[in-house]
Amino acid sequence: MGFGPCGLLGHSLGGAAAILAASKLKTVRSMATISAPSKAEHVRHLLAGSEDELLSEGRADITISGRTFELEAGFVHDLATHDVLGAVASLERPYMVVHADDDTVVRVSEGEALFAAAQEPKSFARYPDGGHLFGNRSHADRMTADVVSWFNATL
């Protein structure tokens, strides 16, 4: 039993992973990314101060917007092998970029690069505030409504 047509949504590095997956999965009929980098290796700047630990221990903890994540050396090494911009350029389906101007983790220029590389139909939902996590409830509600509208219109 397979899956029917679906929409795919990813946030931050998960957005880059969603783009890479959608470029291979024909059941993905529409997609959106929130605060996604245009290059998977973008995460390297988040390793400042942790690279020695990553090399010597094979793993390191990084903190993004107050949340701690464990990364393994193999994961970081693999990042350089993925072409996110090439994958988004190859998508032949609707794509929505969501990004906040004040995102300090993944700069809005990353979202602009994704949008520029994407084929039509495409949309850029840009918010003056919201940060990387859209932590303010009203910002999150507005962004969620926009993404749901996108999927309703494109699926």
Question: Model segments located where?
Answer:
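Short alpha-helix in the alpha/beta-hydrolase fold that links the catalytic acid
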Residues: R93, R107-A116
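Gly/Ala-rich beta-loop-alpha elbow adjacent to hydrolase catalytic centers
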Residues: G10-G14, A18
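Catalytic histidine-centered segment of alpha/beta-hydrolase-like enzymes
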Residues: G130-R142
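Hydrolase active-site cap/lid region
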Residues: K24-G74
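Acidic catalytic loop of the alpha/beta-hydrolase fold
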Residues: D102-V106, L133
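Short beta-strand/loop motif that positions the catalytic acidic residue
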Residues: L91-E92, V97-H99, D103
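Alpha/beta-hydrolase fold nucleophile elbow
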Residues: G2-G10
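Catalytic histidine neighborhood in serine/cysteine hydrolases
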Residues: A118-L133
